[in-house]
Amino acid sequence: MAITIYTYSNPYEINKEPYFASIQNCFQLCVSQTLVNGLCDQYKDFYKGKLTTVNRFINQLYSDWESDSVAISQRAAIDNLIEYIDFSMIVDDISSEDVITSLKRNRSDVVESIRTMFELGMELGNIKSDELSYEQKCIVEIYKELKRTDNKFFAIKKGFKEEEIDSAIDTLISDITKNVESDKIQNIRKDSIVIHGIHQFTPIMLRMIEELSKYKLVVILFNYQPDYKNVYQTWLDVYSSFEAKIVYSPRNLNNESQMFDGGKIADNIAAIIAGNTGVIDFSKQIEVTQFDNATEFAGYIAKKFEQAESLRKEDSYAHPALYYMNEQFYAANSDVNNILKIYFPEQFGERAFLDYPIGHFFLSVTNMWDPESQVLYLKDFNDLYECLSCGIIFEEKHGELVSILDKTRLFIDKETTIKGIAKRLKRLKNRIDEITENEEKNRVFQRIEYFDVSIPEIDKLIDALNELNEITKYFYDDFNDAKNDFKSFYKKIGDVLIKKVLNVEEIDSGFKEIVKRVLKRLDEVKDVEANASFDCLKETMQLYLQQIPGENRGANWIVRNFEQIDGDVLRKNRSRIAKTYHFACLSDVDMSITHKDEFSWPLDINFFEVAQAPVDWKYQVFVTSRLEYKNFRRYALVYGLAFSKCAIKLSYIKNEIDGESELYYLLRILNAKITPYEPEVDNRGQKKADYIQIDNFAMGAFDQYDLMRYRICKYRFLLESIVEEKSVYKDEFLLKKYLTIVLEHRARKYFEGKSFVRNIVFDYLNEQMDELRDTVLFVNYADAIDIVRTALAYLEKYSLYNGKFMLISEKEIDYMIKREIFLTAKLGKNANLDEKEVFKNSTQSEVDLELSEKTLNEMSYRRNLNTLCANCSEKDICLESFKSKKA
């Protein structure tokens, strides 16, 4: 093989290395796009096109193997083999059903493991099955069957001709250099291929290098610092497995690390790793910011990004937002981007089709469909919300169906199928008809949210559910859980997209353009022949339903991972803003790695070290690089600190998903000072949303109980008296409290003036509860017992005089009404001065005077945290009750 490995001592001065003249005009492959950008920024001889990423070239050279259509077919083939192979012949003492369940649950990892084995070209005769776990034996059996049958979807092209390699290079250069002069393109040499900065090799990368080396001189470059030899040892461990000599740079160029704080920290970390503690410089203490959790860290980053957006606006949007940020973030664990995507979705490139509401529709329908019973089965109620809110199901006003579903939720909550929900809604219609005809029932039940829905609204929801069933039936009518035709399924999805999206005028043109690109994508994979289980089909949706990428819509990650440090330190800061490099997530947990970081399940180091002798250099390089990933993270931190010619900041997250974590041990050894993050309090940009104002709203008539609401809280008065015109209870806690009061009042009226006999009253309460149970379906048996016992206890304590039920006076009726409206009404000695003022009675003239139309139209309906908030029917909208009084 024609492979040469060179090191360079300073990434800012590669052009001073003796070999630079021989490589500067060659076609070059980099480990990441950030390294491409950094090298092109730093060296005038480099430009995009001459330099590109390794992965982009692999996608071009191995276009079939890397295509989504092959990935889909591979998943289907493996899924069918999992069903076909008799694993009981391979694994003793474990049922085949358990094995199949395990393999299917981890289908994606299984596919990745099989692909790895094919990319490594593993020989079955060299695998020692006795040394494998039962899952690994199953994987090997699947691999063996695919090899035995020469499955066409697992055939990786090998034995390339030089013309094919040159064609792949030319095509890639042409795609990237559309705006570059043709003379420059023609001068790109293809006799030598330069590869930059790869530490984490994949098997397909190594195959590519081997193929290139048959016709080209492959020159591999990486940075090496003799002063940090223990830190850089990880690179030597990986590259020593190549069948090529490493030629070290003769230069030991001063990287001026001591001029910057980051360089001093890098020197100290390197000294610890080398065991040379005597040279550690403790003159300046390292400062580390401690974030309590990932959300707090995301909030800190979000503020920085928002400040950058403001500067960008002032600069007439001349540059991207990241250009204006005064901190550039690098994290050992970049999962915080998942939170930032919610804050700033446009920053992370074009949203995938499946991330749009209409995309959610297809995912949710698939989640709900049960292939065995052939019905839509609700495992997660949110799936139904997604289907009704996306725009596929017709509604006159956007959000109307979800609003109706919300109101009826407690009545239908126990149903598990869409058909069952539709039946339950018809039952609700009958109940509403019965209640409407009975004045007393209407008075009592109007405060329960699902009885505050109109018959036409329920009909709309039933029609929507029927339409959802029809669409689903169209998708899955000829499906079962055995072999399903993917081609037929996705053709139907395309038909629905055309009918429900492209042909609908109300949907904006921007989203229609995305749908057109999804349809184009479906057209590209329309000939994929894949038949597999329904679960496998669900997993392929991410591959099928993605749009062809739009121009200039790539992601600009706000927080970058450590693999991107090497290129970014080379970028020239052309903005007027001084940059700080912020190295984040520096905890022991985040700086270490999991087994998943090393190999896909069920493969592990034991599989590669024990099950098969490492007979091939590619095999050795791959395994070594995966095992060295932990040390690579450590190297990346030191590299970033050493070559960052700017201010630096360090931080870690204290509370992670798996519990509390500690600062990275090397920083603890250096006696780093940990300072908890204290957010700056700045309310200037916050929206004042603690009140609402209305203008020329048509007011109805008010009574003294409306005035009581007004005294309690203007915001509550607006929602209950003006908007809803009554108190409507929406959550189970308040509804159960209300039902308790209803039972108490029924008993008081029924037994008025009669002697209290506990058993008789208890039986009466149970009878009334049984009568209500058919209407209040959210109350279970245990709840009913609690409600009856609570009502009985109240009656014994407050409704008796000399062993008899008290007569109900006008004053008592007034008190009962107050309890039904406010769920509490403290009077007399039990009430404080504020409550006495709130619940005092008023004449109608007093009500009209205080609640005049002029007053109400000029009023600011402000939230007011008070002792009655916990029983407010609007508390989940207002949210004031969830605040502490101190706050």
Please name every model-derived segment.
Residues 128-242, 290-294, 569, 579-583:
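Conserved helicase NTPase motor core
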Residues 27, 32, 51-57, 61, ...:
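Conserved helicase core region in the C-terminal RecA-like lobe
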Residues 664-753, 818-820, 865-866, 871-879, ...:
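C-terminal, charged and often intrinsically disordered regions of DNA end-processing helicases
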